[in-house]
Amino acid sequence: MRKLLSRFRYQIAIFLAVLGPGFITAVVDNDSGGIYTYSAAGAKYGYLPLWTLLPITVVLIITQEMCSRMGAVTGKGLSDLIREEFGLRITFLMMILLVLANFTNVVAEFAGIASSLELFHISRYISVPLSAIGVWFLVVKGNYRSVEKIFLFACVFYVTYIVSGFLVQPDWKEAAIYSVKPVLLLDGGYIYMLIGMVGTTIAPWMQFYLQSAVVEKGVSAKEYAASRVEVIVGCIMTDVIAFFIVVACAGAIYRIAPRDITDAKEAALALKPFGQYAFLLFSAGLFNASIFAACILPLSTAYSVCEGLGFESGVNRRIREAPIFYFLYTLLIVAGAGTVLLPHFPLVKMILLSQVLNGVLLPFVLIFMVILINKADLMGEWVNPRWFNFTTWVTVVIMIGLTLALVGISVRGMP
């Protein structure tokens, strides 16, 4: 019995030691763009899109686990491996696409910050610049361990969406049915929403950030089992939160009158009739998610570009040691925050576009990942099992199919 307890304590200690990259990456996936996408899905289509969360969770676990494993085994980031195995030209093209997609995501995060604080009558011309400065100082003046602790603390606040979901008192029977009953409508808006839901849940930036964070934290192949548990727990948690966001908006908006919503702020206001707490919790959750992701997305982009093009990177390095890394991080924050402050800028379209761009870029990132992780000279005994490969290729085919369907429907002028 003593041996069993000792082994259990050892496993817990290992888990706590590696806790961070997988859990943070999965949970921050529910950023302001994600919250808007899930809110819009629930407001317009009710409980119908819930069925997508189950397969999305499975694919999210597989993709995140692959990145965590590659980082632990090779000690290199994803863009670093792409450059070494496929050459600088392909890597450069991938980085351009990733920067474009990530920039729209950064804009979405600062739009979320502005929207959440406008609910409390704080002007975006105050909230956005102050948040941008705070985000910049957090990473530039901290180190990996201190930044990670703050990120883990921020994860706790996502429970606000679960509480909001219960306060709205939705139709739980309908929610349960459509969680397992696939519904596919031949409708441009619905398919666009599905691509957005997949794109916001399994975003390309996540794969790059997770692998880089695993490497910087120093997780080794010996600690891989604990790291895998962390990834699985984080992925399940992120889609539980997504479920409650869809359910809250289906109960608060769709049940009364299905409609499009302009932003996540409108979703929060729709919860007011169900009590002040529902409104406050949803609003607080939106601010937390937005500022959390506003830290990580520029960080992920800086990691990816610097690794891919061979520059020094890492939060543990000082500015003079990794000037390009910190320049990119600063540039994305300034440009993202500045865009939100432009008058009459179409922020809502930008937010949904960012999620769809994620969905369009995702198949290409997954193709690189599955090729890399099956290289025996790179991964040794840690190559992918067959069913991982099968699931990943099926995801690639489905995402390409959804994208082509959306293009076809748009061309034919269907609603």
PLM region spans:
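Extracellular/periplasmic helix-exit of transmembrane alpha-helices
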Residues: I61-S68, V73, V215, I236-E266
